[in-house]
Amino acid sequence: MAGEAASPPLKVLAAQLRAAGRGAGGTWRLSRTETGRAPLCLRAVWMQGTVLQVERGGGGSARLRDGSGHFTVLGVEDVPRGRPCLSAGKYVMVMGMVRACSPEPVLRAIKMTDLSENPVHEEMWGLEVEELHRVIP
């Protein structure tokens, strides 16, 4: 895909990503058959969830849960502002490159931010994702 502009991270829920399959050139194909639309090809995603567990060392990893399921984020100790987010119960935003989708999504972290201070972030997340996917052609 040389010469193509990189797509921004796509907001997704764990359940949506879990159903994605391998695409061409290292992309993942996010199915949208239920809406009658063509699949979306993606490499990077934006996800939000509550930190359940953190493993230190080797770049670190974290297990998170959003309203639709669980996902794992690798390299959490290597991203700017990642370490302050690394405690159970924090609600965080993660941008990352998709490494696997099944049986559970696995991301390599690019960016993490703690969103715990404002509960509106968690309350609105599912609606934000739903609205975005409704307007993407």
From Swiss-Prot:
Residues of the DNA-binding region: 45-115
Domain of life: Eukaryota
Keyword Nucleus in annotation: yes
Keyword tags: DNA replication, DNA-binding, Nucleus
Listed InterPro entries: NA-bd_OB-fold, RMI2
Membrane-crossing residue ranges in chain numbering: none
PANTHER family linked: RECQ-MEDIATED GENOME INSTABILITY PROTEIN 2, RECQ-MEDIATED GENOME INSTABILITY PROTEIN 2 RMI2
Subunit note: Component of the RMI complex, containing at least TOP3A, RMI1 and RMI2. The RMI complex interacts with BLM.
Protein name: RecQ-mediated genome instability protein 2
